[in-house]
């Protein structure tokens, strides 16, 4: 059944006009963009129109995730070519790809940013404008679907880019290297996708290469990714062990053989023809179909009924019923997932069209995905609960009880309905890019309603309103202007001045500058930024270039929130921090070459931390100075002691206002004698505080002052870590009427905390801490001994385990609570076709024990991992790879601290 749309797609791709546009777009793509005008001006309604429902059902927001060099960009280029989007196949080695459009990407042959592309599969034809339902036994891939594709990086330094993209995906294609199998970075991204509950299919690539082992890779999917592999295709090797020429489809019981060329010429064989052409492959295909039906029957009751309807004949089950069963199992949220597996060789143009059919047949449309989490007025829940009004009713009841009022439920429901009617659209900004021609582009995913051109967008994170002058549909680095971005789609807003990555944008009806309460507090789940571990100094060439440099750095931070900028108080140097060496190198390229900042960057350094070795006594400081021409006076008492995040917390003191843990430090604020009351608006107040200063402002000012002091240690000037600061604010001693402004309180807290850090007892003081990394190294058996010796002796690392297959969630690099509760899958119970060349040939048993893959899990100081890749490659004959993430900061031993300090000062031994 997949064969018909596959052939139709090939024919349509040949015949379609590529119009006069330099983009080479199908004219119907442009028409579909214009068709979005129908959505303009209509206020949001929970009952989506029939036309919109049809459009949404035929929309797929998917991502491509994989280890570096697994073939993500190569596969994407083939997808664009076969969909009719491009007229030639882009090549990574030539630097002619559509998705890798940054100069740094084309120079290095790697993906750095997540490129967003929209195309149609199968390519649109004149009759594809309607949204009539499909016949029951017709697969979804028979009609054209809109595919919004995100090509993500595979390099460990760009993990934040991957997380940023995963947040807005509905489904994903995970590409595996058929030679290397499941690699460390693949596991990391796979389990990140599990936390967002993203349905995934697996595509085993590079099966044309020597040493490719499809069967072994299938078993690794079971043991390392923690799911049941559903083998939907098996590779077709000429004569059983010759050249890779095609695939055998277990769903449709047919063979597909690709001719030489661009991959558009495909010859199809039914089971009888396959049996006469390749009898061994036909027998294996039958075994694959039996295994697939058996696996689905274990997880889907409807498949069991269909199996009995077909008189218990595995081969008689209709292909579309298998597709629907696979889809149900894939979209099921509970229990162990089934992982559909497909085969191909993208560089040889084999297997990409059936993969696109699988995307439209198996991956979910926006309404079928788990609802995103939102918070509104301090109440959390799902987006659909918000749009139905239930979440607003809960929030209204909570707000009424906080004010001491008792509203009727009917009145709260009426207010909720009124608020929801005013909500026209809700979107998440997941990426900000500074385009040299178009200015700042903000990539958004619309979760409800629509974003219209010239509408007012309210940013609930920054509490600012901005107009959306232009809306675009992006085709990598090219764009088509549209009038509206509808629900479930990904688009770009040009011309926004304030929006950052992770901000929530809402549109609403009415003339007010801000949405009505509580819509102004609506936030989609934000994207958490991992801590940076490398930094480099940035210096402008002259004083006149400093302003330009600051503007460029601000733009860089809007684009990539995983970068941080700080200023060293002593030297006045600007420091740029990032996730890794390559990350900072790319940031430097963007800063100097793309943003044209006239500056120089110093060498990349490691971000160490300081920690207290003992407790200080209470230190009281009174701040008494003019701030911006206004007298400010306030006081505060601070004590400092070591803090272990893993220790059990004790009951807080009754006078405690807040306990906050940030960057490995704990701040406790106590206010004895402060009589806290909640007013009618739900705001905490105290009669002892001067007008204009509520409890929230007091708490925030003290926290900010303390954080400013902790950003700089007393001995080595590195940020503090593992520090507990107790701030005591006594209104009788530390409050001076209207002079105690938030600025004065913040300054008093900073002075008291800094003094307490300097007052640590002699002999205690502070010690240096260094980042320790969780490292997973993949090598073959022959290199294992040399690599283990290098890690444990030369680099001062600690080996955790040596395993042939280590599931990543057990190593601490990432965690997925659902996987931890399920028992591991026995690879021997998994169906996998035999690999060619398994038997001994010329006296060599492949795979031999010497090249059997092994995994080393270790904890190693980051300093020893700088530039480690070239050492690993020399130890493993170029075959070793590794991935690492920050585990924790650990206190250094005295000799190690002395050596590091000597190196930082430039001393020589």
Curated annotation (Swiss-Prot):
Q: Which CDD domains match?
A: EF-G, EFG_III, EFG_mtEFG_C, mtEFG2_II_like
Q: Does the keyword DNA damage apply?
A: no
The GO terms describing molecular function are: GTP binding; GTPase activity
What residues does the tr-type G domain cover? 57-367
| SUPFAM superfamilies the UniProt entry points to | EF-G C-terminal domain-like, P-loop containing nucleoside triphosphate hydrolases, Ribosomal protein S5 domain 2-like, Translation proteins
Residue numbers spanned by region Disordered: 121-148
Alphabetical GO biological process terms:
mitochondrial genome maintenance; mitochondrial translation; regulation of mitochondrial membrane potential; ribosome disassembly
This protein is called what? Ribosome-releasing factor 2, mitochondrial
The record's annotation in NCBIfam families points to:
small_GTP
State the taxonomy lineage: Eukaryota, Fungi, Dikarya, Ascomycota, Pezizomycotina
Classification via HAMAP family:
mEF_G_2
Q: Which family does it belong to?
A: Belongs to the TRAFAC class translation factor GTPase superfamily. Classic translation factor GTPase family. EF-G/EF-2 subfamily.
Purpose: Mitochondrial GTPase that mediates the disassembly of ribosomes from messenger RNA at the termination of mitochondrial protein biosynthesis. Not involved in the GTP-dependent ribosomal translocation step during translation elongation.
Q: Where is the composition biased (Polar residues)?
A: 127-148
Q: Where does this one sit in the cell?
A: Mitochondrion
């Amino acid at each position: 059944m997949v064969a018909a749309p596959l052939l139709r797609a090939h024919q349509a791709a040949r015949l379609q006009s590529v119009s006069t546009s330099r983009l080479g777009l199908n004219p119907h793509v442009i028409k579909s963009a214009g068709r979005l005008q129908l959505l303009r001006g209509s206020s949001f309604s929970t009952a989506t129109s029939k036309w919109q429902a049809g459009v949404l059902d035929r929309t797929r927001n998917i991502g491509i995730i994989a280890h570096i060099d697994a073939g993500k960009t190569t596969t994407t280029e083939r997808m664009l070519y076969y969909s009719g989007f491009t007229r030639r196949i882009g090549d990574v080695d030539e630097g002619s790809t559509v998705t890798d459009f940054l100069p740094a990407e084309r120079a290095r042959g790697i993906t750095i940013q997540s490129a967003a592309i929209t195309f149609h599969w199968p390519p649109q034809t004149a009759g594809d404008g309607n949204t009539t339902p499909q016949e029951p036994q017709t697969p979804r891939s028979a009609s054209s679907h809109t595919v919004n594709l995100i090509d993500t990086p595979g390099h460990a330094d760009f993990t934040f880019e991957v997380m940023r993209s995963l947040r807005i995906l509905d489904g994903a294609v995970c590409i595996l290297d058929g030679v290397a199998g499941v690699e460390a970075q693949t596991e990391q991204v796979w389990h990140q996708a599990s936390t967002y509950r993203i349905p995934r299919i697996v595509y085993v690539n590079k099966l044309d290469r020597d040493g490719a082992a499809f069967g072994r890779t299938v078993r690794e999917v079971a043991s390392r990714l923690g799911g049941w592999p559903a083998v939907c295709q098996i590779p077709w090797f000429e004569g059983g062990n010759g050249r890779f020429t095609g695939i055998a489809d277990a769903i449709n019981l047919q063979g597909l053989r690709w001719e030489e060329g661009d991959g558009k010429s495909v010859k199809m064989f039914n089971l009888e023809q396959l049996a006469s052409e390749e009898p061994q492959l036909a027998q294996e295909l039958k075994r694959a179909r039996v295994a697939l039906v058996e696996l689905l029957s274990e997880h889907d009751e409807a498949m069991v009924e269909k199996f009995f309807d077909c008189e218990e004949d595995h081969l008689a089950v209709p292909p579309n019923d298998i597709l629907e069963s696979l889809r149900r199992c894939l979209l099921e949220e509970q229990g162990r997932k089934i992982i559909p597996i497909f085969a191909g060789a993208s560089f040889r143009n084999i297997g990409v069209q059936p993969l696109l059919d699988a995307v439209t047949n198996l991956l979910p449309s926006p309404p079928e995905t788990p609802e995103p989490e939102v918070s509104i007025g301090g109440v959390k829940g799902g987006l659909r609960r918000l749009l139905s009004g239930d979440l607003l009713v809960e929030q209204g009841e909570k707000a009424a009880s906080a004010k001491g009022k008792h509203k009727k439920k009917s009145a709260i429901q009426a207010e909720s309905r009124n608020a929801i009617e005013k909500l026209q659209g809700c979107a998440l900004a997941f990426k900000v890019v500074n385009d040299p021609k178009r200015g700042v582009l903000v990539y958004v995913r619309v979760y409800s309603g629509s974003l219209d051109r010239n509408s007012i967008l309210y940013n609930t994170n920054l509490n600012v309103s901005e107009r959306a002058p232009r809306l675009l549909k992006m085709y990598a680095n090219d764009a088509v202007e549209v009038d509206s971005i509808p629900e479930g789609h990904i688009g770009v807003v040009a011309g926004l001045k304030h929006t950052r990555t992770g901000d929530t944008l809402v549109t609403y009806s009415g003339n007010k500058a801000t949405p009505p309460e509580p819509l102004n507090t609506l936030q989609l789940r934000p994207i958490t930024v991992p801590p940076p571990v490398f930094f480099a100094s940035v210096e402008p060439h002259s004083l006149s270039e400093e302003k330009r440099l600051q503007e460029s750095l601000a733009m860089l931070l809007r684009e990539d929130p995983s970068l941080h900028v700080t200023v060293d108080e002593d030297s006045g140097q600007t420091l740029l921090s990032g996730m890794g060496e390559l990350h900072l190198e790319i940031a430097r390229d963007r800063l100097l070459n793309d943003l044209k900042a006239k500056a120089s960057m110093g060498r990349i350094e490691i971000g160490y931390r300081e920690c207290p070795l003992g407790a200080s006594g209470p230190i009281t400081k009174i701040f008494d100075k003019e701030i911006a021409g206004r007298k400010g006076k306030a006081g505060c008492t601070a004590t400092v002691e070591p803090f272990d995040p893993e220790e059990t917390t004790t009951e807080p003191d009754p006078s405690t206002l807040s306990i906050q843990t940030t960057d490995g430090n704990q701040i406790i604020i106590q206010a004895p004698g402060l009589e806290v009351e909640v007013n009618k608006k739900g705001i905490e107040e105290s009669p002892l505080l001067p007008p204009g200063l509520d409890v929230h402002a007091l708490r925030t000012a003290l926290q900010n002052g303390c954080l400013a002091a902790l950003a700089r240690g007393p001995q080595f000037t590195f940020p503090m870590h593992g520090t507990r600061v107790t701030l005591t604010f006594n209104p009788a001693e530390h409050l001076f009427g209207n002079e105690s402004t938030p600025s004065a309180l913040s300054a008093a807290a900073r002075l008291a905390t800094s003094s307490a850090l300097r007052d640590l007892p002699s002999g205690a003081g502070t010690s240096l801490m260094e980042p320790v990394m969780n490292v997973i190294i993949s090598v073959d058996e022959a290199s294992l001994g040399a690599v283990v010796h290098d890690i444990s002796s030369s680099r001062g690392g600690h080996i955790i385990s040596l395993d042939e297959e280590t599931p990543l969630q057990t190593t601490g690099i990432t965690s997925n609570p659902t996987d931890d509760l399920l028992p591991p899958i026995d690879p021997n119970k998994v169906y996998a076709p035999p690999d060619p060349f398994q038997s001994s040939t010329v006296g060599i048993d492949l795979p031999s024990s010497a090249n059997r893959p092994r995994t080393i899990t270790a904890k190693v100081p980051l300093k020893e991992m700088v530039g480690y890749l070239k050492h690993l490659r020399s130890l493993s004959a170029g075959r070793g790879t590794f991935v690492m993430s920050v585990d924790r900061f650990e206190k250094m031993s005295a000799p190690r601290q002395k050596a590091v300090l000597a190196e930082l000062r430039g001393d020589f031994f």
